[in-house]
C-alpha cells in the first residue's frame, strides 16, 4: 500500500527513473551473484558489476563537502558499511576520468563515436577547440546486500544539454566528458502533480523499449510554483566577463542580449548592480532600481571587451557589492556571465568555488551562465554554481536566454529548497543490484543524509530534477507477490524559516505499466533523453542500443507530444545519428 509521510513543505524537483531488470539468471551458483552490464537496460557486453568507477574529481568533491560518490560495483554510494566503502576505494576502475581536460574538436578516434579510422567532419570548427570539461566517470552496479542505500544531492543544472546542442549545431558530436545525463533530463518539463506548498513525490514506470528484460520506474518530485508577483524583491549583481576572450557575438554580444531580457522582466522594486572584470575588476553600475531601466540597459550596452581574465577579482568585487546591497526581505543573487576562463589571479576551479562558500552560506546565491564555445571552461562554471548554492546554465541562443530569464524567471531567482538531497532505500530481498545513471559528482555519504550541515542542492520555484536507476531483481522474485521494492526519502531546508523537512514515498510495483505504450508520454520522453545522454558519453552500458532506434522513438514523441523542446530533441538525435 502506498504511503506518504510529510512533515512540512517547500521546494521543487523531479526524479525520474528506476530500471528493474527481470529476475533472470543463468548463474549456476545461487549463492553468488554477479551483476553484468548485459543483464541491464543497456544490454552491454562490457564490464561486470564488480568494477567500480570512481573519478579523482569525485574524491575531491567528497573531501570538500563531506560527500562520497556512488559509482561502484558491489560497493556503496557512501557507506552504511565501512567495509563496503573500503571495497569502493580498492576496486576503482579505469573508466572514470576525474581530470579536467582541454578537449579538441571532434572525438578521440580510439573509442569515440567517429570510429578508429574516421576523421572528424571536414567542417570541424576551430571555435570548438580548447574547451575544458571534467570526466566524472559513470556509475556501475551496487550490490543491494552490501549497501541498499543510494544517496545524492539534487541538481537542477541544464548546462550540459545546451553545450551538447551547441556542438551538434557546429556539426560535431560533443566530447563524452561534457555529457552529464541528469542535466539532459533536467532540460525538459514533466507532468508531475504540483503541491500548493512544498514538495510532492509521485511514482510511475514501465518496461524499457530497448531491452525486454528491464523496466523503468519514475520517481517524480515536484515543488510548489510561485507566481512572479508573489516573490520578494530581488537584488541582483551581474558579474560580467569583459576580457578579450569575450570579443565574439556568441559571447559578449549574447551576454548583452540575455541580460537585457532579464532586466526587462524584473519588477520596479528589484535592483541591479553591474561588475565587470578583465585584468582587474570594476563597478560599472551601483545598485540601481529597475524603475531606472534605461540607465541599466545603457550600462549593459556600453560594455566592451579587452584584456586578460581575472575571474577571482570579478567574483570578489561582485560578492562585496552584493553584500552591501543585501536585502533581508528579498532575493540576493550574483549572476556570473562568462566563458569560465580564468588566467589571472586564482585560476583553479576548485579554489574559486571554495572562495565563495561563505557568501553562499550568508544567503547570496550564484547563478552561472556560460557563453561561447572554444576556450570555454565548463568545469569552472559548474563547480562555482554547486558551491555557490545556485545552478549552472549555458546560453547558446537568444531563445535559450528567453527561457532562462523570461519563461523561468521565478525559478531562476527564487530558491525554495536548500541542501536538498535524496536517499533511495532498496529492499535487498527484492533488489539484487542497482545503478544510478548520472549524478556522478553529486554523491552524499549514506550516513550523512540526515546531517543537515552537509552541503547539498538548491532548487528554485517550480524546478524539477530527474534521476534514473537500473535495477536487477533477486532471482525468484515474483513481481505480482511484492508490493514494494524500495522507498524514496527527500530532505531539504526551508530557506524562509530554516526548518528541515523530510518526506518519503514507497516505490510500488503496482505503479508500473506492463506495456511501454501505456506509460505516460512524458515518462517516455525522459527515458529517451537519458538514453541519448548515455550514448553520447560512450557509456558501455549503452553499447547495445542503436541510436537509430532511439531516433525513431524521438520522431514518434515529436509527433505525439510536439512543442519546441521535443522537436528540438528529435532533430538533435537525428543529427547525432548522422555523425555516429
Please report, for each region that a protein language model flagged, where it lies by residue.
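C-terminal motif of bacterial Sec signal peptides marking the signal peptidase cleavage site
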Residues: 19-22
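Exposed acidic/Ser/Thr-rich ligand/metal-binding surfaces
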Residues: 24-29, 199-419, 475-480, 570-580
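Membrane-embedded beta-barrel scaffold of Gram-negative outer-membrane proteins
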Residues: 425-427
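Ser/Thr-rich, Pro/Gly/Ala-heavy low-complexity intrinsically disordered linkers and tails
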Residues: 25-104, 108
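Acidic/polar low-complexity segments with low predicted structural confidence
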Residues: 130-215
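Bacterial N-terminal signal peptides that target proteins for export
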Residues: 2-10
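Long, acidic serine/threonine- and proline-rich intrinsically disordered regions
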Residues: 143-146, 158-165, 414, 418, ...
